[in-house]
Amino acid sequence: MSGADFQLRQPTILIVDDDASLRLLCRVNLELEGYNVLEARSVADAEDAVAGDEVDLFLLDVHVGADDGLALMRSLRARDHGAPVVVFTGSAVLDSATIAEADGIVPKPFRLEQLLDVVRRLAPHR
C-alpha cells in the first residue's frame, strides 16, 4: 500500500440524546471539527448504531426520553466496548459512582467550547 492509498479514519462520535436540537448543534459543530458523527434519539437507536458502526466516543444524555442513559453506559462497559463515554446532564447532582464511571461530564446547559474541549481530549484526531 502506498502512502497515497493510506487514509486515516477520523474518530466517530455517537450522540445519544432525545433532544433533536441538541443533537443538531453537536453534530454540526463536531463535523466542522472533522469528526464523523452518528445520532441516536433513544437507547435502542444507540444499540443499533453500536452494532453497525465503530464508535470512538459516546456523548450520552443521562435521561434519553424514558430510557436510562446510564444503563446504556453500564451495558457498554460490561461488553468491554472500550470507547470513552461523556455524560450530558441537566441534573445538579450526580452520585459519585456515576461520576467515577463516566470519562467526562458535561453539565447542561453547556458552552460549546466545554464540549469540544472534552471531545478533543478523549477522541483526538489520528
Question: What kind of region is each of these model predictions?
Answer:
Residues D48, L70-H81:
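Short amphipathic alpha-helix used as the core "switch/output" element in two-component signaling
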